[in-house]
C-alpha cells in the first residue's frame, strides 16, 4: 500500500503527536526503513521505458532549446563617459585617510587589470558575429555592429589599426600614454613594434602619384613589405612645432584587417587602396586632404605622407578599388532588388573607416577574433534595449583552461547576520559596472571581437550567394550578393543608420579596453573593486553600513533623514572617483531591504515575492507519475534549492532529486512526495539573525550511546544498535536541542558543526534539519567537552563547565573593515548632531 502524505509527515516527526524523541529519531537512521519508504514513494530510479518529459512549465531539458527571439526595434543602450580616475587610491585617502592593506591591494588589482592566458585560439573574422538569428541575419549584423561601434566610441574597446597599433576614444590612462605613437623618441627604434602611427581624421588614405622611386624604398621580408632601415627614420621638427613621423609600416591596412593571402603584390594593392575612387573625389573637392593630418593624444599634430605599398598590382588593375559598398555605384543594376539602387541614394557615404582620438602600440595582434558576439534582450523585464553577449568560453575549456581566482560570496546566514537590523536601506545602481575597470593594452590581443564585413558575412550565412577569396572585389561576383531579402533589410536599416551603413559594412577588429563580461576573471575583479569601495565608505561613516555584491551596492542608516544625507555624501564621493551611478534607478527600500533575491528585515530573511511565485507556478505544472528528464530536474532543483533554507526540512528534502541528477536518470514524482514538497514550500520560515551568547549546553556521542551536559545537569542514553559516529553525534545534538531548547550547542563533531545534513540517511536528515533549525553550534575539543563522560556511561565525574562564547560570523566576505590604528590626517570636520547614538555599531 502506498505511503500516504499524513503517515509520511508523522514518520518524519513533523507532527506534534510523535512519541519520545530518544526512541523515534534513531529509527529514522535505519537503512531498511529508508529503503522501504523510498520504494513506497517511488523514489528508486528504475530505467523507465516511457518517454521522458522534457518540459515542465518554463523549464526545458535535453533536446529542446528555447528559440531566441530577435527584436528588430532593439535600442542600443547609451554608455556615458565612463572613466574611472587613475588617482583612485589618492582620492580614497583624501576621503577616509590611509587605506588598509586589503583595500589598497584590491584597488591596485584593477589599475589596470591584467589578463594573460597561456593559450589563445584565434578564429576567422567570419565567426565574429554569431548567426544567432537565421531569419534576421542582416538586421542582427548591423545592430551588433552598431553596438560595437557605440562601445568603441565610449572608450570601452580598442580598434585594431595594424598588427602593432590600435586606436581608441576617451581619456587615456598613464600606461596608455607610455605606449602612444609619436610620443616617444623616434631615434634608434627597434623593429616594427615601436613604430609611430598617425591618425587619419577622415579615415581615407590619399594616394600620391605612383612611381618606381617609391617602390625601391621598400623591401620584401617575412612579415610582408618592410621599410628599409634608416630612411626617414629620424623625426624632424616642423616649422610650427609639429612632429613629423616616419612612414608607418606599409602592412597597415586602413580597415584594421590584414589580407589573409600569401603576400602577392596584386592582392595587396587591391585590398589596401581602400575607397580609391571616393578619396579622389574628395581630393578634388578639398585639396587640403591630399596630406592627411591627425592628432596624437599628446596634442602634437602628426603629419603623414602616405605611400602606396605596391605599384605592381595597382597599374594592372586600373581603378578597381576594394570598397565593396561603393563598387555598386558604377555598375548596371542587375534587378529591381540590386544594391546599386540603395548605394545611389546618397552621393557621399562618408568615410570607409574611422580612427580613434588616440593611438597606441600593442603586442602583435592578428586579424582574427578570439570570441563571437550576438545580441539578446537586456533582461527579462526590459526587452526594448539589447545586451551584447560575448563568448570567450575558449578560456574556460580544455586542458589549457584558465583557473579563475575564487572569491568569497556571502552565504545566507552571513548575509542575515550582517544586514538583518532595524536600519533604513537604499540600493545604488552602477551603470555598466564591468566597463569601469580598465584592462592593460597587452591583454587586448587575447580579447578580440569584430566582423568580416557585410559582403563576407552575408555570403557565409546565405546559401544562394558565395564570395570566394580569389574573386573578392571583382565585378563578376559583385551582384551575387544581391537578393530581395538583403535589399529590403538594407532599405529598412537605411531609415535607422543612414550613411553609417557604409561604415558598418566594412570589416573591423576590436579589442577590449575595459573588462568584458564573458571572461571568468571579470566577476572576481568587480567583486574586489566594489568591496574595497564599500570598505572605504564604511570607515568614512562608521555609524552607517555600506555593503556590495558585484555591482549591487546598498547603504543603511538609522533613520531616513540620516540615510538621505549619507546618500548625498556617498554619491558625490563615487562620482568624484569616476564611478557612474544611474540615479534614476536608486531604490529606497525602507526597513526591508531587497537584495540578492532576498527580503532582509529586522525579523530575518525570506525569498523575494517573485521567487515564491515561481515556486508556486512550478508545483502547479509539475506532473505526477511521469518520468521527468534529469536536465529539467536540475532546473527545478536550482529553483527549490534557493528557497530550501526557509523550509522545515531544508536541502535533505531534495536529496532524491539530487540522486537522479547524479545518476543522469529520469525522476518520477509520486503524489505523496509532490504533496510533501509542495507543503514544505507553501509555508516558508524566515532565517533569523544569530545572536552572540554563552554556550551552556553540550552534546557528545559514541557509536553505542549519547551524553548531554545542560548547565550542571548530566544525561546519558544508549542506542539499540551501534550507529556510525557522525549519525550518533547528530542524534545527540538533536536530543540536546529538544531537551534544553537552547539555540547554542557545543559539539566536537565537524559534520554536525557544518550543518550539512544531506550525507545522513534521508529520513534522519529531513527530521534533524527541522529539529536543529535556528541552532548555532560552537566547537569544543573532545578533551574539554563536559558531555564526553556521560556519553561513555560515566555520570559520576563532572568536568568543569566551559565558558564558551559564541560570536556570529559574517563569513569570509571581509565586509566590515574597522578603522586602522593610524591617525587619519584629515582636517577637522564640522560636527553635526547625528541622530545616532555614538556607541552604536553595525551588527
From Swiss-Prot:
Residues 262-277, 287-299 have a biased composition (Polar residues). Keywords: DNA replication, DNA-binding, DNA-directed DNA polymerase, Endonuclease, Host-virus interaction, Hydrolase, Inhibition of host innate immune response by virus, Inhibition of host RLR pathway by virus, Magnesium, Metal-binding, Multifunctional enzyme, Nuclease, Nucleotidyltransferase, RNA-directed DNA polymerase, Transferase, Viral immunoevasion. Residues 178-346 are annotated as: Spacer. One of its GO terms (molecular function) is RNA-directed DNA polymerase activity. Residues 180-202, 226-315 are annotated as: Disordered. Terminal protein domain (TP) is hepadnavirus-specific. Spacer domain is highly variable and separates the TP and RT domains. Polymerase/reverse-transcriptase domain (RT) and ribonuclease H domain (RH) are similar to retrovirus reverse transcriptase/RNase H. This is Protein P.
Amino acid at each position: 500500500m502506498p505511503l500516504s502524505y499524513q503517515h509520511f509527515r508523522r514518520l518524519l516527526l513533523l507532527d506534534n503527536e510523535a512519541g519520545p524523541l530518544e526512541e523515534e529519531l534513531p529509527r529514522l537512521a535505519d537503512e531498511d526503513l529508508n529503503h522501504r519508504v523510498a520504494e513506497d514513494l517511488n523514489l528508486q530510479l528504475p530505467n523507465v521505458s516511457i518517454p521522458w518529459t522534457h518540459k515542465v512549465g518554463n523549464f526545458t531539458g535535453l533536446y529542446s532549446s528555447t528559440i531566441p527571439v530577435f527584436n528588430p526595434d532593439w535600442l542600443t543602450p547609451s554608455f556615458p563617459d565612463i572613466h574611472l580616475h587613475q588617482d583612485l587610491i589618492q582620492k580614497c585617502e583624501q576621503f577616509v585617510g590611509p587605506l588598509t592593506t586589503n583595500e589598497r591591494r584590491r584597488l591596485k588589482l584593477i589599475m589596470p587589470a591584467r589578463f594573460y592566458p597561456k593559450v589563445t585560439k584565434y578564429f576567422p573574422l567570419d565567426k565574429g558575429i554569431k548567426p544567432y538569428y537565421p531569419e534576421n541575419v542582416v538586421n542582427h549584423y548591423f545592430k551588433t555592429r552598431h553596438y560595437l561601434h557605440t562601445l568603441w566610441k565610449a572608450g570601452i574597446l580598442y580598434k585594431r589599426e595594424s598588427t602593432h597599433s590600435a586606436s581608441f576614444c576617451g581619456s587615456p590612462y598613464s600606461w596608455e600614454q607610455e605606449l602612444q605613437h609619436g610620443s616617444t623618441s623616434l631615434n634608434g627604434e627597434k623593429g616594427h613594434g615601436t613604430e609611430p602611427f598617425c591618425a587619419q581624421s577622415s579615415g581615407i588614405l590619399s594616394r600620391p602619384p605612383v612611381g618606381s622611386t617609391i617602390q625601391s624604398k621598400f623591401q620584401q621580408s617575412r612579415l610582408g613589405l618592410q621599410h628599409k632601415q634608416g630612411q626617414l627614420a629620424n623625426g624632424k621638427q616642423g616649422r610650427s612645432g609639429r612632429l613629423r613621423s616616419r612612414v608607418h609600416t606599409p602592412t597597415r591596412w586602413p580597415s584594421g584587417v590584414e589580407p589573409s593571402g600569401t603576400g602577392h603584390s596584386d592582392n595587396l594593392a587591391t585590398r589596401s587602396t581602400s575607397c580609391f575612387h571616393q578619396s579622389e573625389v574628395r581630393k578634388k573637392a578639398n585639396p587640403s586632404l591630399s596630406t592627411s593630418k591627425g592628432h596624437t593624444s599628446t596634442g602634437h599634430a602628426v603629419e603623414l605622407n602616405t605611400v602606396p605599398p605596391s605599384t605592381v598590382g595597382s597599374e594592372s588593375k586600373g581603378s578597381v578599388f576594394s570598397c565593396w559598398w561603393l563598387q555598386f555605384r558604377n555598375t548596371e543594376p542587375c534587378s529591381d532588388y540590386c544594391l546599386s539602387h540603395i548605394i545611389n541614394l546618397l552621393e557621399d557615404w562618408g568615410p570607409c573607416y574611422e580612427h580613434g582620438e588616440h593611438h597606441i602600440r600593442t603586442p602583435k595582434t592578428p586579424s582574427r577574433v578570439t570570441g563571437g558576439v550576438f545580441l539578446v534582450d537586456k533582461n527579462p523585464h526590459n526587452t526594448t534595449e539589447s545586451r551584447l553577449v560575448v563568448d570567450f568560453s575558449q578560456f574556460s575549456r580544455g586542458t589549457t583552461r584558465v583557473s579563475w581566482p575564487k572569491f568569497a560570496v556571502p552565504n545566507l546566514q552571513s548575509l542575515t547576520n550582517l544586514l538583518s537590523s532595524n536600519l533604513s536601506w537604499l540600493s545604488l545602481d552602477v551603470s555598466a559596472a564591468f566597463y569601469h575597470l580598465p584592462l592593460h593594452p597587452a591583454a587586448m590581443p587575447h580579447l578580440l571581437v569584430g566582423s568580416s564585413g557585410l559582403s563576407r558575412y552575408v555570403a557565409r550565412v546565405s546559401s544562394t550567394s558565395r564570395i570566394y577569396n580569389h574573386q573578392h572585389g571583382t565585378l563578376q561576383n559583385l551582384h551575387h550578393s544581391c537578393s530581395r531579402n538583403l535589399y529590403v533589410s538594407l532599405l529598412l536599416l537605411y531609415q535607422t543608420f543612414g550613411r553609417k551603413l557604409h561604415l558598418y559594412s566594412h570589416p573591423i577588429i576590436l579589442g577590449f579596453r575595459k573588462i568584458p563580461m564573458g571572461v571568468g576573471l571579470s566577476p572576481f575583479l568587480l567583486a574586489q573593486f566594489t568591496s574595497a569601495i564599500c570598505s572605504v565608505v564604511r570607515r568614512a561613516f562608521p555609524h552607517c553600513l555600506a555593503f556590495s555584491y558585484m555591482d549591487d551596492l546598498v547603504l543603511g542608516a538609522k533613520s531616513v533623514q540620516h540615510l538621505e544625507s549619507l546618500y548625498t555624501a556617498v554619491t558625490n564621493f563615487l562620482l568624484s572617483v569616476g564611478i557612474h551611478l544611474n540615479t534614476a534607478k536608486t531604490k529606497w527600500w525602507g526597513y526591508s531591504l531587497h537584495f540578492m533575491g532576498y527580503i532582509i528585515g529586522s525579523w530575518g530573511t525570506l525569498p523575494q515575492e517573485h521567487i515564491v511565485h515561481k515556486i508556486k507556478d512550478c508545483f502547479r505544472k509539475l506532473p505526477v507519475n511521469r518520468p521527468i528528464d534529469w536536465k529539467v530536474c536540475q532546473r527545478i532543483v536550482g529553483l527549490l534549492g534557493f528557497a530550501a533554507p526557509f523550509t522545515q526540512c531544508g536541502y535533505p528534502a531534495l536529496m532524491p532529486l539530487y540522486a537522479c541528477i547524479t545518476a543522469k536518470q529520469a525522476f518520477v514524482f509520486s503524489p505523496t512526495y509532490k504533496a510533501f514538497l509542495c507543503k514544505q514550500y507553501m509555508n516558508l520560515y524566515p532565517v533569523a539573525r544569530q545572536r552572540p551568547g554563552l554556550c551552556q549546553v553540550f552534546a557528545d556521542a559514541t557509536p553505542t550511546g549519547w551524553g548531554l551536559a545542560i548547565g550542571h545537569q548530566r544525561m546519558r542514553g544508549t542506542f539499540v544498535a551501534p550507529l556510525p559516529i557522525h549519525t550518533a553525534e547528530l542524534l545527540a545534538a538533536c536530543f540536546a536541542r529538544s531537551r534544553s531548547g537552547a539555540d547554542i550547542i557545543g559539539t566536537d563533531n565537524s559534520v554536525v558543526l557544518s550543518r550539512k545534513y544531506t550525507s545522513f540517511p534521508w529520513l534522519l536528515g529531513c527530521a534533524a534539519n527541522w529539529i536543529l533549525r535556528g541552532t548555532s553550534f560552537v566547537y569544543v575539543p573532545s578533551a574539554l567537552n563536559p558531555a564526553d563522560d556521560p556519553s561513555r556511561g560515566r555520570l559520576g565525574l563532572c568536568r568543569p563547565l566551559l565558558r564558551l562564547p559564541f560570536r556570529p560570523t559574517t563569513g569570509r566576505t571581509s565586509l566590515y573593515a574597522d578603522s586602522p590604528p593610524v591617525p587619519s590626517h584629515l582636517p577637522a570636520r564640522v560636527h553635526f548632531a547625528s541622530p545616532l547614538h555614538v556607541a552604536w555599531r553595525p551588527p
